């Protein structure tokens, strides 16, 4: 009954959510059991099967696959990610409504998340992008769900813990956690947050990161998330590094970019002629990572303007109307439904731990082969849908600029600042430390839409929208409680007059002393609440 009431009261968003659900059912029918993202998916699956870290990438997604292994179904993994995509839309809608925005505006903010074809494609892929985005949106929901009120320590700690978990899926989660801690420290200085809240958030956010690093150290003898941070930063410098300017020491000269036309930065890691392949121990050995980090820092210090220009160029790619072909056409094709079933990853390619792609797929999928199959006509429908239904980078830039402009004008746009900072961080950090990739934009969209819609919220949400009762959550409704109705005033009742007592006849007994006369009724009750004062009733959902 409560669900039916909720659907009726939020019919516009319910229709959008139902259409988005149908779209995800179509994706599940079109590409079975799950779409495969090359070496990335192979690495995560190997971690999920053997609990062995891959030094080239953080393996938190592998732990998710390990947790989902008992049903032995890769299709279940894709289904879960579709649910997370829908859940992000629901959380954005709920927050927008809490901040007093109308249903149409709250629903509009969810459209890029619910219906973007590239969001849908990544939900179908065995990659951590969608779980990462969900953790970020859920953390924002916990932090912002009570507009105009102090954040409780427990809720803030839970949000920090979620951001710590997100760092195990994408390392940029560490930067988001640092932003939250910086905001809390600033709030502490102006007495808007207590020291207990800040300490709880710090410990909660550090817990998953420290636990993963400890697990990584048992295999690699290095307390870290990966063994590739230096390698990726080195690749960033390959688009501009000039060793005649850098003058690296002899041990690092091998890392100078090869002569000739420069490639996209990240390709220098995977290219067959990469200088990394000439070093002993491989591309991701501890020694290689250390040398690459030293070279990268020298290059940035020697050529800061060139570094800034390279980063600016790649950040600008995020806002092109047409999706840029970067790093190369082969990478871009991986984000297309049209190429989902292309066997561009050899089935016998080796995976961490000594397995193969085909063998690991079968091992996870109850012994059955699990290559991606495109099922017609559903796959053809999705290919057509992807040609038109996506958020161009230019519109993402407009969403970010709109949120920033409104915040600058209104100054106190409650709730918009933190999601805006998160969205910009997700867009900027990858080109800052590695390279631009189209998939890095998708997790930024929910936070960007949330920031834009909250920037237009009332300066302070009405009190009846800030206080949502437990009964509202229990019935599944999300409407604010109705304000209390004052009780009608009752007219004062005059005290009855006592009839005069006749004086007694003459008596030989002397008259007694006079007793004090009681005060009138009005004076006796002046210290009590007036009968005309309405009694406040608790709000109901």
Where is each model-derived feature located?
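Start-transfer (signal-anchor) and selected internal transmembrane alpha helices
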Residues: 1-24, 458-464, 541
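Transmembrane signal-anchor helices characteristic of membrane glycosylation enzymes that use polyprenol
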Residues: 9-35, 115, 204-215
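Extracytoplasmic catalytic/substrate-binding loops of multi-pass membrane glycan-assembly enzymes
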Residues: 30-44, 52-72, 225, 308
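Multi-pass, polyprenyl lipid-linked donor-dependent membrane glycosyltransferases
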Residues: 39, 77-86, 108-143, 153-154, ...
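Transmembrane alpha-helices of multi-pass, membrane-embedded glycan-processing enzymes
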Residues: 65-72, 77-91, 132-135, 390-400, ...
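Membrane-interface anchor segments at the N-terminal boundary of transmembrane helices
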Residues: 75-76, 309, 313-419
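Short hydrophobic alpha-helices at membrane interfaces in multi-pass membrane enzymes
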Residues: 104, 142, 146-164, 196
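Membrane-proximal stem/loop segments at transmembrane-domain junctions that anchor or position
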Residues: 226-363
């Amino acid at each position: 009954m409560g669900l039916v009431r909720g659907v009726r009261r939020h019919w516009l968003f319910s229709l959008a959510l139902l259409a988005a659900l149908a779209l995800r059912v179509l994706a599940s029918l079109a590409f079975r059991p799950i779409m495969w993202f090359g070496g990335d998916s192979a690495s995560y699956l190997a971690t999920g099967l053997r609990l062995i870290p891959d030094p080239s990438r953080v393996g938190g997604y592998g732990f998710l696959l390990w947790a989902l292994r008992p049903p032995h179904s890769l299709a279940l993994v894709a289904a879960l990610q579709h649910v997370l995509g829908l859940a992000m839309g629901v959380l954005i809608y709920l927050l927008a409504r809490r901040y007093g925005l109308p249903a149409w505006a709250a629903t509009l903010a969810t459209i890029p998340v619910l219906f973007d074809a590239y969001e849908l494609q990544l939900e179908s892929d065995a990659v951590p992008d969608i779980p990462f985005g969900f953790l970020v949106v859920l953390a924002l929901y916990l932090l912002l769900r009570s507009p105009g009120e102090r954040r409780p320590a427990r809720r803030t700690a839970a949000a920090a813990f979620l951001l710590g978990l997100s760092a195990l899926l994408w390392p940029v989660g560490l930067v988001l956690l640092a932003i939250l801690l910086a905001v809390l420290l600033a709030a502490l200085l102006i007495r808007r947050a207590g020291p207990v809240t800040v300490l709880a958030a710090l410990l909660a956010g550090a817990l998953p990161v420290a636990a993963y690093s400890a697990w990584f150290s048992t295999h690699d003898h290095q307390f870290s998330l990966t063994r590739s941070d230096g390698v990726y930063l080195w690749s960033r410098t390959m688009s501009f590094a000039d060793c005649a300017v850098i003058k690296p020491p002899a041990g690092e000269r091998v890392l100078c970019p090869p002569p000739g036309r420069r490639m996209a930065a990240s390709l220098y890691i995977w290219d067959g002629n990469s200088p990394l392949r000439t070093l002993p121990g491989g591309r991701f050995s501890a020694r290689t990572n250390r040398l690459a980090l030293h070279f990268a820092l020298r290059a940035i210090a020697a050529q800061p303007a060139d570094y800034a220009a390279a980063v600016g160029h790649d950040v600008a790619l995020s806002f092109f109307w047409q999706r840029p072909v970067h790093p190369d056409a082969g990478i871009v094709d991986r984000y297309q439904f049209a190429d989902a079933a292309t066997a561009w990853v050899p089935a016998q390619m080796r995976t961490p731990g000594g397995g193969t792609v085909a063998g690991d797929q079968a091992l996870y999928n109850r012994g059955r082969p699990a290559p991606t199959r495109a099922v017609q006509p559903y796959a053809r429908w999705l290919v057509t849908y992807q040609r038109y239904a996506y958020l161009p980078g230019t519109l993402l830039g407009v969403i970010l600029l709109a949120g920033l402009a409104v915040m600058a004008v209104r100054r106190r746009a409650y709730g918009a600042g933190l999601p805006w900072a998160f969205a910009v961080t997700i867009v900027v950090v990858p080109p800052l430390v590695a390279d631009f990739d189209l998939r890095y934009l998708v997790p930024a969209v929910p936070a960007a839409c949330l920031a834009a819609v909250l920037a237009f919220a009332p300066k302070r949400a009405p009190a009846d929208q800030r206080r949502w009762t437990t009964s509202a959550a229990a019935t599944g409704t999300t409407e604010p409680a109705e304000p209390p109705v004052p009780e009608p005033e009752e007219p004062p009742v005059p005290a009855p007059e006592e009839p005069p007592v006749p004086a007694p006849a003459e008596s030989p007994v002397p008259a007694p002393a006079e007793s004090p006369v009681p005060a009138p009724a009005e004076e006796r009750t002046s210290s009590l609440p007036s009968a005309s004062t309405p009694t406040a009733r608790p709000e109901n959902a």
